[in-house]
Amino acid sequence: IEIAIATLATDRALLLLGVPGTAKSWVSEHLAAAISGDSMLVVQGTAGTAEETIRYGWNYAQLLAKGPSMGAVVPSPVMRAMQTGKLVRIEELTRIPAEVQDSFISLLSEKVLPIPELNEYVQASKGFNIIATANDRDRGVNELSSALKRRFNIVVLPLPDSVEEEVQIVETRVASLGRS
């Protein structure tokens, strides 16, 4: 966890990697809440995740009524995080098609989201960053490109070493729920 926090403090994106059941989503949610005060800026990766889900969409009624403008842009969670200087969570990054994954490369390198239709762009506010999760041994995953991997610090979350350790983790988690 210390490495994850240090990564985000140095303005580098974080990739939490591990097999299913290693609490990647739980860790990303709690890091985002602790650092940004908001863990709800989330893109859920699936095989059907489109580039618009990451970048922005259009309010077609507004587009038809007033033409192309920033008022017709429907910001994605990524765009909202950039505008507000918060962390955005990308769940299941490796389930997103490879060609869509590549849209993160310029976001992470330049911290800029172009809107070419308007000849505009969104510059990330201070504090913006990405926490992504990925399964490394699951079916239906797309390999990350080396260019994208280079833009993340990768933290591998291991499985518990024993049944006893797993029971202890569950007991601790259940006890903490009672205090919330």
At which residue positions do the language-model features occur?
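AAA+ P-loop NTPase catalytic core and its hallmark functional loops
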Residues: 1-179
